[in-house]
UniProtKB/Swiss-Prot annotation, chain A:
One of its GO terms (molecular function) is Rab GDP-dissociation inhibitor activity. Expressed in roots and floral buds. SUPFAM superfamilies: FAD/NAD(P)-binding domain (SSF51905). Regulates the GDP/GTP exchange reaction of most RAB proteins by inhibiting the dissociation of GDP from them, and the subsequent binding of GTP. One of its GO terms (cellular component) is plasmodesma. Belongs to the Rab GDI family. Keywords: GTPase activation. GO terms for biological process: protein transport; small GTPase-mediated signal transduction. This is Guanosine nucleotide diphosphate dissociation inhibitor 2. The keyword Transferase does not apply. It comes from Arabidopsis thaliana (Mouse-ear cress). InterPro entries: FAD/NAD-bd_sf, GDP_dissociation_inhibitor, RabGDI. The keyword Nucleus does not apply.
Swiss-Prot record, chain B:
It comes from the Eukaryota. Induction: By abscisic acid (ABA), phosphate (Pi) deprivation, cold, sucrose, mannose, and water stress. This is Ras-related protein RABA5c. The gene is RABA5C. A motif (Effector region) lies at residues 41-49. InterPro entries: P-loop_NTPase (IPR027417), Rab_GTPases_membrane_traffic (IPR050209), Small_GTP-bd (IPR005225), Small_GTPase (IPR001806). Keywords: Cell membrane, Golgi apparatus, GTP-binding, Lipoprotein, Membrane, Nucleotide-binding, Prenylation. It is found in: Golgi apparatus membrane; Golgi apparatus, trans-Golgi network membrane; Cell membrane. GTP binds at residues 19-26, 67-71, 125-128, 155-156. It is a lipid-anchor. GO terms for molecular function: GTP binding; GTPase activity.
Length: 444, 214
C-alpha cells in the first residue's frame, strides 16, 4: 500500500465507482478503498443476514424468509430512466456487458385517494381515469405540445420562450386543474416539490420529454429499467471497469484517515499504519465529516412481502409517487416495489420501499400513507438517515466529495453530480451526447 | 434473446477463475483462449473475459470465461463477479503452499455468492516447476475429493492439461444443464419476461444460463 497514486477514492458507492472507472479509463493511477467488507457503501444491496444485522442487531434472519443470499435489498431504492444519464454512462463505458436489465412494469401516482396509472402520452391521457372528459382533452393537447417541442425549432414553440415563461403560466395556457398539475409535475416531470411552478418551464418540458422518450424506448409500461440482482450491481460493475483499466481495490480497510500538508492540501491516506500517497482524494461525505454539512434527512421503510402492491395490476416492479399536496406535505413520498423476478428475493417474495424527505422525527407515523398502500407485510423496518453536501473548496485542498444520494426516484441527479465532479477533477467534460445514437440504435 | 424455440440453438456458460494472486489465472485463460503465454505478465490489467466455443453433441457451446481483473490481490473480488457462474476453476500454485491453503477461503466466497455453479475444478498450476514443488499431487487430489471438485495439474507455460481442464468443466456444465433444463423451463420463462437489452446483442438467440438457471 506504500505506493503513490494520482487519485485515491474512498468509499465504493455508485458515484465513487463511476468516477473511479472513468478516471482509470483515462489512464489515471487509482487506488480505491472502502472501510466495509462489501461494495456499494450507502448504495449497496444487502442480503438478508446483513439486513437483519443492520436493523435488528442480530446476525441471523428467521428461516421462513428463505436463503439469505437470495435477497438483494437496495439501500438507496431508485429506478433508471430508460433514456437517462445513467443509461448513457453505462453505454459510454460499455459497462452494460456486466449487467442485465428488465423493464419496470408500472408507473403509478396517488391522486384523489387512489393509486392510478401515470399517463405520459396524448393517447394515454385520453384513456386515463385520472381525469374527466374535458380535462383529458386539455391534458392531451398539453402532452402533444410537449412531444412536438424542439428547442431548435421555433415553429414548435407556440410563440413562447420557455426559458422565460414559468411552468405555472404554461400550464395556465392549457387550463389544467390542480390534480393534473400535480401528477404532471411530480409523476411525469418527477419534481420533488412545487418550486418548479414558479421557475422557467423549459426544465419541466425537458423532463416530461425524457419520461415520454424513456417510456417509448423499451415499449414497456413504464419509463424505467432495473438491473437483475438489485442496484448494488451498479457500483460493482463500474468497480470492475476501473480494475480492468488498472485500478487497485482494497476492501475492509478501517479508518482510512486522510492526511494533509501544512497548507491544507491532501497528501495521502493512512490505514492500518500504512500511508498511500496521492495528489487528489475522491470520497463520499462519511470519509471527510469535517468538510461537509447536513442538508436534510430521509425517512424510509423497507418491507418484505408475499404479494405485489395492491391496485398496481399485479406488477412485479412498480413505482407509486404520492405528490406532496395529496398528503398536505412539503415533499413527495415514494413507494417502490421489486420482486423475485428481478432476483432480489426468493421465489414468491417482494421487497417494497417507502421513502421521503423527513419532516418529523417519527418515520413510522410519517410514512403511514405510503406503508398503508402495501397491504400486509411479512417484515418491515423503519429508519432515518442524514444527507450531506460538501462545503470545502476542491481547488484549495484537492478533495472532491460527493453529495449524499437524494430522495429522487431515479438517477438523473446522481449522474449529474458525478459528471460535475469529473469536470472538477480532470478539467474535462464527459460528452454523453455522442452516445445518443448508440442508445437509440438499441431500440428494438 | 428470448426466442428459445429457435432451431440451431446455442449455449453460453459463464465460468469464473479464482485463486490467489500470481498463481497463473490469466495465463491459463490466454493459453486456452489464444494459445499465448506471457512470462512477464504482472497483476492483471485489461483482461475482461474470453469467449471460447466447442462442439458437444453437434451443438455449439460457448464458454464465457471471466478473469478477476486483479481484484483478488487485496481480496476485493465483487460479489457480482460470481453472479450466475455455472462453472468455476479454483487455481493454486504447486510451488507455493500458501496458495493451496487459501483454496478453502475461495470456495467459501464462491459458495456465498453463487448457488448456480454446477461444475467446479481444482487446478494445481505451474506443474512444469517440478523441482521446486511444494504441494504434492496427492494433497491436491485428496482436497478435491473431500470438497467434491474435479482435479487436474496444469502448466500454462508448456500447455499441459490446459485445454483438457477447461473442456472437462464445459462438458460437465453442459450435461448438467441439459438434464436440469427439462424441469426448469417454466420458471426460467417467468424470469425472462420484460428483459431489455441496452446494446445490440451479438449473440441473439443464444441461451444464456448465466442468470436464468436459478
Amino acid at each position: 500500500m506504500d505506493e503513490e497514486y494520482e487519485v485515491i477514492v474512498l468509499g465504493t458507492g455508485l458515484k465513487e465507482c463511476i468516477l473511479s472507472g472513468l478516471l482509470s479509463v483515462d489512464g489515471v493511477k487509482v487506488l480505491h478503498m472502502d472501510r466495509n467488507d462489501y461494495y456499494g457503501g450507502e448504495s449497496t444491496s444487502l442480503n438478508l443476514n446483513q439486513l437483519w444485522k443492520k436493523f435488528r442487531g442480530e446476525e441471523k434472519a428467521p428461516e421462513h424468509l428463505g436463503a439469505s443470499r437470495d435477497y438483494n435489498v437496495d439501500m438507496m431504492p431508485k429506478f433508471m430512466m430508460g433514456n437517462g444519464k445513467l443509461v448513457r454512462t453505462l453505454i459510454h463505458t460499455d459497462v452494460t456487458k456486466y449487467l442485465s436489465f428488465k423493464a419496470v412494469d408500472g408507473s403509478y401516482v396517488f391522486v384523489k385517494g387512489k393509486v392510478q396509472k401515470v399517463p405520459a402520452t396524448p393517447m394515454e391521457a385520453l384513456k386515463s381515469s385520472l381525469m374527466g372528459i374535458f380535462e383529458k382533452r386539455r391534458a392531451g393537447k398539453f402532452f402533444s405540445f410537449v412531444q412536438e417541442y424542439d428547442e431548435k425549432d421555433p415553429k414548435t414553440h407556440d410563440g413562447m420562450d420557455l426559458t422565460r415563461v414559468t411552468t405555472k403560466e404554461l400550464i395556465a395556457k392549457y387550463g389544467l386543474d390542480g390534480n393534473t398539475i400535480d401528477f404532471i409535475g411530480h409523476a411525469v416531470a418527477l419534481h420533488t416539490n412545487d418550486q418548479h411552478l414558479d421557475q422557467p418551464a423549459f426544465d419541466t418540458v425537458m423532463r416530461m420529454k425524457l419520461y415520454a422518450e424513456s417510456l417509448a424506448r423499451f415499449q414497456g409500461t413504464s419509463p424505467y429499467i432495473y438491473p437483475l440482482y438489485g442496484l448494488g450491481e451498479l457500483p460493482q460493475a463500474f468497480a470492475r471497469l476501473s480494475a480492468v483499466y488498472g485500478g487497485t481495490y482494497m476492501l475492509n480497510k478501517p479508518e482510512c484517515k486522510v492526511e494533509f500538508d501544512e497548507g491544507g492540501k491532501v497528501i495521502g491516506v493512512t490505514s492500518e499504519g500504512e500511508t498511500a500517497k496521492c495528489k487528489k482524494i475522491v470520497c463520499d461525505p462519511s470519509y471527510l465529516p469535517n468538510k461537509v454539512r447536513k442538508i436534510g434527512r430521509v425517512a424510509r421503510a423497507i418491507a418484505i412481502m408475499s404479494h405485489p402492491i395492491p391496485n398496481t395490476n399485479d406488477s412485479h416492479s412498480v413505482q407509486v409517487i404520492i405528490p406532496q399536496k395529496q398528503l398536505a406535505r412539503k415533499s413527495d413520498m415514494y413507494v417502490f416495489c421489486c420482486s423475485y423476478s428481478h432476483n432480489v428475493a426468493p421465489k414468491g417474495k417482494f421487497i417494497a420501499f417507502v421513502s421521503t424527505d423527513a419532516e418529523t422525527d417519527n418515520p413510522q407515523t410519517e410514512l403511514k400513507p405510503g406503508t398503508d398502500l402495501l397491504g400486509p407485510v411479512d417484515e418491515i423496518f423503519f429508519d432515518m438517515y442524514d444527507r450531506y453536501e460538501p462545503v470545502n473548496e476542491p481547488e484549495l485542498d484537492n478533495c472532491f466529495i460527493s453529495t449524499s444520494y437524494d430522495a429522487t426516484t431515479h438517477f438523473e441527479t446522481t449522474v449529474a453530480d458525478v459528471l460535475n465532479m469529473y469536470t472538477l477533477i480532470t478539467g474535462k467534460q464527459l460528452d454523453l451526447s455522442v452516445d445518443l445514437s448508440a442508445a437509440s440504435a438499441a431500440e428494438e | 434473446m428470448s426466442d428459445d424455440d429457435e432451431r440451431g440453438e446455442e449455449y453460453l456458460f459463464k465460468i469464473v477463475i479464482i485463486g490467489d494472486s500470481a498463481v497463473g489465472k490469466s495465463n491459463l485463460l490466454t493459453r486456452y483462449a489464444r494459445n499465448e503465454f506471457n512470462p512477464n505478465s504482472k497483476a492483471t490489467i485489461g483482461v475482461e473475459f474470453q469467449t471460447q466455443s466447442m462442439l458437444i453433441d453437434g451443438k455449439e457451446v460457448k464458454a464465457q470465461i471471466w478473469d478477476t481483473a486483479g481484484q483478488e490481490r487485496f481480496r476485493a473480488v465483487t460479489s457480482a463477479y460470481y453472479r450466475g457462474a455455472v462453472g468455476a476453476l479454483v487455481v493454486y500454485d504447486i510451488t507455493r503452499s500458501s496458495t493451496f491453503e487459501n483454496v478453502g477461503r475461495w470456495l467459501d466466497e464462491l459458495n456465498t455468492h453463487s448457488d448456480t455453479t454446477v461444475a467446479k475444478m481444482l487446478i494445481g498450476n505451474k506443474c512444469d516447476l517440478e523441482s521446486i514443488r511444494a504441494v504434492s499431487v496427492e494433497e491436491g487430489k485428496s482436497l478435491a475429493e473431500s470438497e467434491g471438485l474435479f482435479f487436474m495439474e496444469t502448466s500454462a507455460l508448456d500447455s499441459t492439461n490446459v485445454k483438457t481442464a477447461f473442456e472437462m468443466v464445459i462438458r460437465e456444465i453442459y450435461s448438467n444443464i441439459s438434464r436440469k433444463q427439462l424441469n426448469s423451463d417454466s420458471y426460467k420463462e417467468e424470469l425472462t419476461v420484460n428483459r431489455v437489452s441496452l446494446v445490440k446483442n451479438e449473440n441473439e438467440g443464444t441461451k444464456t444460463f448465466s442468470c436464468c438457471s436459478r
